[in-house]
Amino acid sequence: TVILKNGDELDGKTLWSDPTLDLAVVKVNAVNLPAAKLGNSEKLTVGETAIAVGTPLGLQFQHTVTSGIISALNRTVQIPTERGENFMEDLIQTDASINPGNSGGPLVNLKGEIVGINTVKVVSAEGIGFAIPIDVAKPIINHFIKQGKFTTPYIGVVGFDRQIASYYKQNKDIMAGVYVVNIDPKGPAYLAGIRIDDIITMVGDQPVN
């Protein structure tokens, strides 16, 4: 059920979801609905104002608005998923309050433009929350508008780049590419011959960096 600001309730249908990206597309059959403008997360700067909207801790606190700043950009966070441990990358870090239930709500700038989608917070600390940049969601949205569906690419590896490998004290001198730390034994990469400890430097003729 999708509940609008005026209290109207609409039936929602989940067209697509991906727990790894922590994103979903929900469709409602209605017309003339107001829509928020999508901003450009590439233009964000550290220190600018960020406003988070959501429903923390249940419906009794729906439409809660909190504010803060953009604390950092391009953060990487390790989270558990149904596929095992996953690394969410390129996240926006903010000190605007994000609590359970805020996930999926918008992070907006002072123009009211959506620049991110709230996702997770560090439970052991206050003032450290994260949002998915809206530019990550835009291709998915556009694909749905044009084709009515979206298939999540999946190769079945967990990889560290040079910076993350160094952070986790992996003794690998990686100058380029991605170091494979885990692999799905039923996934495409394994079937193609990729193994743990490999370094992927090219996919076809496309460099991996």
Predicted features and spans:
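Serine-dependent protease modules
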Residues: 1-169, 174-176, 181-185
